[in-house]
Amino acid sequence: MRGLLLALYVMAMPATADVLQQFVARDGLTGQFTQRILSPEGAVLDQSSGDFKLLKPHFFWWHITSPDNQLMVAADNSLTQIDWALEVTVERQLSDTERSPFYWLLAPRETLLTAFTLDATGAAVTLTPRDPSAYYQRLLVAQEGPDLWRVTLLDQAGQSIDLALSTLPEVTLVPGDFLVPSVNF
């Protein structure tokens, strides 16, 4: 019986380690998301949904389509935020410490091992920053289906952001997919 349990454990190890590898091995991701921001007590503070695009090394597109219409586009070291309801556009430079969690999730494995401790369990991997002053204290990545990922982030205040990412398979992204749309305000 022990031998069977050990064999099952050893067979499960590569699958567990592969969860993060499958995520970081991609050059990019695109699809739909749902996002919930939760208080430390678990109360839902905000919910939104929309579409996203991620492309290595520094391209990020996060378009909230419900309940509002907002867009965040990061290209290299620049971040542009557009809020159509408020008719506001904000552009600013990003430092390396301000990069989104997706920057880390698309980083090479060696970079992750330098910046985080990794704990793989089942179909999930928890990344804990080695730097105790990091804004996000924990990132959990779980594969819930072939094209369904859950990413949960815990910040310094104890709030968590729970993201469900439904990815489109076999979509090739290029930097031109991350152009900021022109607005008339």
Regions found by a protein language model. Name each.
Residues 26-28, 47-49, 57, 67, ...:
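Extracytoplasmic
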Residues 1-3:
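Positively charged n-region of N-terminal signal peptides that target proteins for export
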Residues 51-99, 161:
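An acidic-aromatic
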Residues 7-14:
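N-terminal signal peptide c-region/cleavage motif recognized by signal peptidases
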Residues 114-185:
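Gly/Pro-enriched, hydrophobic low-complexity segments
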Residues 29-35, 48-52, 60-62:
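One face of beta-strands
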Residues 35-39, 56-58, 66-68, 129-131, ...:
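Short, well-ordered turn and helix-capping elements at secondary-structure junctions
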Residues 18-39, 43-45, 82-137:
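Flexible, processing/modification-adjacent segments and terminal tails
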